[in-house]
């Protein structure tokens, strides 16, 4: 808590992707990625940031942690996160045409974001509504199904889904 009620704590992470065909101005802003199709970037955010955040929450909850940054100090949690992000990364690279090396940098950026001790995020908040997160078009089930459609077995996503179900039962 901060003495100033208007104080807002933010993180240095940002990503600004704009559909270039919708942009009428010839002016190009620094730090903005102009793309023809936003859908791969929307999926990348869902299958990397959202799936990753939830993976840390459910893995961390099982280990008894209360915050995301606290859970990220546990090598077991980080190993599970990396494994899940590499599985979803295979899908994003195959489907969205992302460069493998660039996607690896994106994964590292996400991991660094979750390790930020100055942005405390409660696992209880991130892990709430587990049934919604197991929806057909959500962060776990959709990439799991789509990975099997390209003959990839999503072992770590399945393991995380088990953790979500375990959390649901408590």
Identify the role of each PLM range.
Residues 1-169:
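Substrate/ligand-engaging "lid" and interaction regions
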